Amino acid sequence: MICIIDYGVGNLFSLKSSLAHLGLEAKVSADAADIRAADRLILPGVGAFGDAMAKLEATGLVPVLKEQAEQKPLLGICLGMQLLFEKSYEYGEHDGLGFVPGQVCPLAPDLGDKSLKVPQIGWNAVHILGDDPLFKYVRDGEYFYYVHSYYGKNCAANTLAVSDYSLPVTGVVKAGKVYGTQFHPEKSGDAGLRLLKAFAEL
């Protein structure tokens, strides 16, 4: 069973629908017992980093996630991926879960092409940097759907894939059993479904 962690942030319905389409059992829950009972965990998220971390802390889930991430695969999606990092500079400075070394920084100041819009909204090719079971059913250069104004930085050793947005945007990270995708697999059509299928088989 996959537990989609419900901490009041994220579009949980589309994610659960994508997993159901694959025939995968998924439960939306903020209950520590459900998280511990699950085979795999997904941490979704949309919105601001600081607010999301505050909600995770308020629900008491931070120590549960740190404990369980050592035992089973965890996938952070979009803001959920950013929460995996040590720190974010979105509207101030905030500590993250600390699974992935590096920081979450604003995209706009780093763009080589200042005519590009921020947030990055839309489809972008994902370039795989190395073999990993998460890419079992995904080909290099396939397109995935992004919506973000911040990105993971100083994390090259943990980066599995990037997309070009006048600079290499961190698309996928990994640290131990913990994975993160900046793009939304649940909004990325067939390629996204195939990535979720591979995650369910980890």
Regions found by a protein language model. Give the residues of each.
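An anion/phosphate-binding loop that grips the pyrophosphate of nucleotide cofactors and donors
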Residues: 38
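Structural motif
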Residues: 42-44
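Amide-donor transfer/coupling interface in amidating biosynthetic enzymes
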Residues: 103-202
